[in-house]
From Swiss-Prot:
Fe(2+) binds at H183, E264. GO terms for molecular function: ferrochelatase activity; metal ion binding. This is Coproporphyrin III ferrochelatase. GO terms for biological process: heme biosynthetic process. It comes from the Bacteria. Pathway: Porphyrin-containing compound metabolism; protoheme biosynthesis. Keywords: Cytoplasm, Heme biosynthesis, Iron, Lyase, Metal-binding, Porphyrin biosynthesis. Its EC number is 4.99.1.9.
Amino acid sequence: MVKKTAGLLVMAYGTPYREDDIERYYTHIRHGRKPPQEQIEDLKARYRAIGGLSPLAKITEEQAKRLEERLNEVQDEVEFRMYLGLKHIEPFIEDAVERMHDDGIKEAVGIVLAPHYSTFSIRSYNERAKAAAKKLGGPTIYTIDQWYDEPKFLQYWAEQVRAIFAAMPERERERAVLIVSAHSLPEKIIQAGDPYPTQLEDTAKRIADQAGVAHYAVGWQSAGQTPEPWLGPDVQDLTRQLYEERGYTSFVYAPVGFVADHLEVLYDNDIECKQVTEEIGARYYRPEMPNTNPLFIDALASVVLKRWAEEGDRHE
């Protein structure tokens, strides 16, 4: 019996591959409006501060490959073939869908490398993928709205956080706080009933409970430079507030809305948040990002296989 082939559409934000890409990348994010030159120079300086460019492109590709390998290791009913589609730089989501179509893929599971649902993120990825498939006449794409509650994903973060707190002397632990964060979005999503903020709060509670952490708070980071209000509190403001009002002197940052080392973590956390902790004389900690950790890849594989199984009747 010939094993069935299914597409694995891995979608992610994308990042500039070289400094020359920065302008066009951010122009795409801004819906075709070129960023002011001052902003471009600021972005270039941020990338240089983390070593030149973000490691995200390489990590995303490696995550997608490892996920494909893992899916084909843990079951033998179907052969998953991976296609990478990015939101703001090539290969675009539409390019990946076109390649699937050209390869004769009839069915695919689409997963976005972001755990929480929002209209700005997950929905926009999934809609672009489905629109591209509809235009081409296939494949059928089974999309995934969120996977923040996948047990192995929560386990990954709980283990990382627990290890940091366990290594602290008891007196330090008593005055330590966990800050769980994700990328801020415009506040208007709340009026639209978007579940994004609630999902982050749920994630934070589950991780703190599993890690046995008594003190935790939810913050937002990396807000866009636009006049409209964004979700808060910002993690830097939250750090100062927790220090001034609660007297915490050790801060553990878990940017769980992200899945890899990239600018928002390596700069916004490791440089900007760290500067705040240094200003107030506090300690800074940040667990390792999931990247290609086997437990995290297993979490993604579980999510994909559950979604594939939900469509089981169609596979007969």
